[in-house]
Amino acid sequence: MVLFHSQASCSKRIEADAIILPFWKLKDKVKCAASIAKEYESLYQVALDNFSAKSREVELIYSCGQGKEKRIVLLGLGKNEELSSQEVLEAYAKATRLLRKAKCTTVNVVLPTISELRISIEDFLTNLTSGILSLNYNYPKYTKESSNDPLLTKVNVLGIVPKIADRIFRKEENIFEGVYLTRDLVNGNADEVTPQKLANIAKGMAKEFPSMDVKILNKDAILKEKMGLLAAVAKGSAVDPCFIVLTYQGKPKSKDHTVLIGKGVTFDSGGLDLKPGKAMLTMKEDMAGAATVLGILSGIAALELPVNVTAIVPATENAIDAAAYKMGDVYTGMSGLSVEIGSTDAEGRLILADAITYALKYCNPTRIIDFATLTGAMVVSLGEDVAGFFSNNDVLAQDLSEASAETSEALWRLPLVEKYNKALHSDIADMKNIGSNRAGAITAALFLKRFLEDQPVAWAHLDIAGTAYREKDEDLYPKYASGFGVRCLIYYIEKFLSK
């Protein structure tokens, strides 16, 4: 993907469907933030009666044949002294949605006068690029004729030296290839995005990037490894499970190794503990954790980061037939720990448990970070805009929080309340797979933590149940799959581990 281009001169810009002009909100007036303002002043001056330039405000007007663009987007950046990275991100995302609805495919973007910016030009460009890329995506609709708005095909950023801008553009484009991969997988039909499909995606990535290797465990290999929890969840499906291990070695001589684990339930019926029909409608997205870790590896491989990262994906359906695993039964995982099934709809933690054990046995991890659409309790707690996370390591938690703030992908650390472990007590097994009807996100995290078995490895669990999928178009995300977490984790890996 090469969408963005840069040009130092505004006067030599190419013709385009539209131009984006930035504006500051002053005390008693509106001021165009770009030096090119005079060329269009007679046109936009009339529109300023209804345009206050408050942060994220957008207005579309026509150029009436004046200049090299057919339309002009007035983009409000608010008060200069209050400008934040997130406001830049959301403002250009909003402008992108407006342009696409107007059927524009090419756009010239005029930067504010650099000396007036309160954030660095690198920060401004990064968030401008991310904002546009986030909404330059189409959900794969299955209608006979496409009803999607056209995508932007060329974005020409004016008033910046290419040497500075192009590096940022290529980096963000590579990251968003990973975001789009995540979205495509989550949005795909469950009958198409099967465990084997995820395995094939991983194989394709290993072929594309020389620094990657892949290992796929089929059903027989899963049983041979005694992954009794993953095997139990898979019993009710006509589709065989897969266990995917995709390794990126960007620094082979280093012993530092990050393992990312993604829940890969490609469709979750709830099993014999059947979900209500309405709750099942979005359950093709229950593999968003798997899609996220594959998207992250795509991004770090494209950026050629000097790190060692392995993505592990336990992939299966949670379906129903006569052989489906049953409530009240006990199954033993790869760790040797036994689990009484209190609910067949608490399957995600079971397959993650075997993945954690595999990582500890074979990967020698420095840290493990898992991603899962794990609990409805997290959605109730934090909604769609914030993902809750748990960690046994304060440094890891702080670094993830910083990455969250820098990328505007909100994470909130929640407590691992050891007292709540008693909710997982079983009289006949080492534990149950579900607690009481309270603190469900915490007890799910405590369940996973048990499978670390006190080994000295840093661990974080990200419950993305609320953030992975959107019911409607939002400021930064299109409807349906969001790709949440890919940008945050790539930032974390690049800043804190690429040394």
From Swiss-Prot:
Tell me the superkingdom of the source: Bacteria
Q: Write out the catalysed reaction.
A: Release of an N-terminal amino acid, Xaa-|-Yaa-, in which Xaa is preferably Leu, but may be other amino acids including Pro although not Arg or Lys, and Yaa may be Pro. Amino acid amides and methyl esters are also readily hydrolyzed, but rates on arylamides are exceedingly low; Release of an N-terminal amino acid, preferentially leucine, but not glutamic or aspartic acids
Active site at: K275, R349
How many and how are cofactors bound here?
Binds 2 manganese ions per subunit.
Cofactor(s) it depends on: Mn(2+)
**Role, per record:** Presumably involved in the processing and regular turnover of intracellular proteins. Catalyzes the removal of unsubstituted N-terminal amino acids from various peptides.
User: Into which family does the record put it?
Assistant: Belongs to the peptidase M17 family.
Quick one: which residues bind Mn(2+) 1? D268, D345, E347
Its protein name is Probable cytosol aminopeptidase
- Asked if the keyword Protein biosynthesis belongs to this entry, the reply reads no
Please give the Gene3D superfamilies that the UniProt record associates with this protein: Leucine Aminopeptidase, subunit E, domain 1, Zn peptidases
Name the EC number(s).
Answer: 3.4.11.1, 3.4.11.10
Keywords from UniProt, A to Z, are: Aminopeptidase, Cytoplasm, Hydrolase, Manganese, Metal-binding, Protease
Could you tell me where this protein is found in the cell?
Cytoplasm
Q: For binding Mn(2+) 2, which residues are annotated in this chain's numbering? A: K263, D268, D286, E347
| Chief site of localization | cytoplasm
Q: Output a single Gene Ontology CC term carried by this record.
A: cytoplasm
Q: Name one GO biological process term.
A: proteolysis
Q: Which PANTHER family match?
A: CYTOSOL AMINOPEPTIDASE, LEUCINE AMINOPEPTIDASE-RELATED
- Please report the organism this UniProt entry assigns to the protein: Chlamydia caviae (strain ATCC VR-813 / DSM 19441 / 03DC25 / GPIC)
